[in-house]
A protein has these predicted regions:
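Conserved, mostly hydrophobic/aromatic
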Residues: 35, 82, 154, 221, ...
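Acidic (Asp/Glu)-rich catalytic clusters
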Residues: 46-52, 69-81, 98-111, 145-146, ...
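Active-site beta->alpha N-cap acidic-glycine motif
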Residues: 23-93
């Protein structure tokens, strides 16, 4: 009987090891959708992605008027890992937002109208106080928690919150305090998505990027989905780096992401889809380390 138990234990151990080993051979892919809650058109696009059922991470902007809709949407999908898209700038000419903590609490972060500056350059040209940056980022986290969101990670809108080593240290401090992961802190390999690809070539671009992935590290695809609606097409980026016809680019990226061809490719046995909740459960918060670059 003793030997039977030993053999059974060995067999189960072998099966478990084989399963883990087989999983280790797969290329891990993590898709992160940014700017959720920015506007209604982005939220509707996010819903299309969520309806595919794939594990996905979605980074929420708590400052925007459509944040409340995003909260109600995200609560309905167990396949999503929710992050806070820490925001310190407001880049649209016709559509501006300001701090969660109130403009009087963080006067060095806002312009004369109480809105965030449009870019990192203009923000840091105003010599923002580190204490105010911490106050504001904390307020954004607290707002998300009060809304009832289960937050798994932090990231940063247009890199403003990690512009300097000092501001990055604030993000790290808050992540440790709230026991949250930070996007790009697990040695993720950044794979440029299709955002800047020509509108007509989004799908082909993304298919090629996935097909040519090589083993080594979790592959991070950051995407910006939306619908080409009057709401989105009216937005004009105050930063020159943004693509023209932004709403068409976002809609094309959405179409590529939810297309049957791309979804079928993602389900190829050689790949393993995961989100930040899954990644953190596998590696633990203690495995995070500051990346060499933003």
């Amino acid at each position: 009987m003793k030997y039977v138990i030993v053999i059974i234990t060995f067999l189960f151990s072998s099966i478990s090891f084989a399963q883990k080993d087989k999983s280790a051979d797969k290329i891990p892919i993590l898709i992160r959708c940014d700017d959720i809650g920015m506007c209604h058109s982005v939220n509707i696009a996010a819903r299309e992605v969520l309806e595919t059922g794939i594990p996905v991470s979605m980074s929420v902007m708590v400052l925007c008027p459509w944040f409340t809709e995003a909260v109600e949407l995200l609560k309905n999908y167990p396949n999503v890992s929710i992050g806070i898209h820490l925001t310190l700038n407001s880049e649209w000419k016709q559509y501006r937002w300001g701090p969660a903590s109130g403009s009087q609490a963080v006067p060095t972060l806002v312009d004369s109208l109480g809105n965030f500056f449009p870019s990192r350059t203009s923000l840091f040209g105003n010599n923002p106080k580190l204490s105010e940056i911490e106050t504001e980022l904390r307020a954004q986290i607290e707002k998300a928690l009060r809304a009832g969101l289960k937050i798994d990670y932090l990231d940063y809108h247009m890199g403003a919150a990690v512009q300097t080593p000092e501001t990055r240290a604030i993000v790290e401090k808050l992540a440790a305090e709230y026991k949250l992961a930070i996007s790009r802190y697990y040695d993720e390999v950044n794979i440029e998505g299709g955002y800047f690809a020509p509108i007509a070539n989004k799908l082909d671009t993304m298919l090629v990027k996935v097909r040519t992935l090589q083993p080594g590290g979790t592959k991070l695809f950051v995407v910006h989905v939306g619908l080409d609606t009057p709401e989105m097409s009216a937005m004009e980026d105050l930063n020159p780096v943004g693509p023209k016809e932004m709403s068409k680019h976002r809609n094309a990226e959405l179409n590529a992401l939810v297309s049957p061809q791309f979804q079928q490719l993602l389900r190829d046995p050689k790949y393993r889809l995961l989100n930040y909740r899954m990644l953190t459960e596998e590696k633990g918060l203690q495995a995070m380390k500051r990346p060499a670059a933003n």
